[in-house]
């Protein structure tokens, strides 16, 4: 799928886990400190949450027109993670990498809020 200004070509996926007891607090912090700035740079952003028995996993998918656009956001290496100031306080472990995928097909309503 060729990249165009209206269609993203790349998805960047970040995952992080916190304890269930701190999940709501982390989500509020992460939305303010992580998601809001990302919305200003990426073509689109999705934030997902899965509550498990003892922990909660957060996943953020950001959509980009190209690897180059993502590289401008990260300052060079598109796989580089920008840990937030309080991530060490909340997360069970700091993620070591992000996943970068080429977007091939997107159909229907993929969600927005």
Regions found by a protein language model. Name each.
Residues 20, 66, 102-105:
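Non-catalytic surface loops within mature trypsin-like serine protease
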Residues 18-47, 78-86:
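Short amphipathic alpha-helical segments
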Residues 31-35, 63, 68-69, 78, ...:
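Short linear sequence elements within intrinsically disordered, low-complexity coil regions
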Residues 1-10, 43-59, 82-113:
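Glycine-rich beta-strand-turn "strand-cap" elements at beta-sheet edges
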Residues 7-8, 18, 26-27, 38, ...:
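Membrane-topology and secretion signals of cell-surface/extracellular proteins
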Residues 10-16, 46-77:
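Short, well-ordered beta-strand segments in beta-rich or mixed alpha/beta enzyme
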Residues 23-25, 69-71, 107-109:
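Intrinsically disordered, low-complexity acidic/polar segments
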């Amino acid at each position: 799928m060729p990249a165009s200004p209206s269609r993203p070509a790349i998805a960047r996926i970040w995952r992080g886990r916190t304890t269930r007891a701190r999940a709501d607090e982390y989500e509020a912090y992460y939305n303010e400190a992580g998601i809001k700035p990302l919305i200003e740079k990426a073509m689109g952003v999705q934030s997902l949450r899965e509550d498990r028995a003892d922990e909660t996993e957060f996943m953020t998918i950001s959509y980009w027109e190209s690897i180059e656009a993502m590289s401008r956001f990260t300052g060079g290496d598109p796989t580089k993670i920008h840990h937030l100031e309080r991530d060490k306080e909340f997360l069970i472990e700091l993620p070591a990498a992000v996943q970068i995928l080429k977007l091939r097909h997107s159909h229907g309503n993929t969600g927005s809020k």
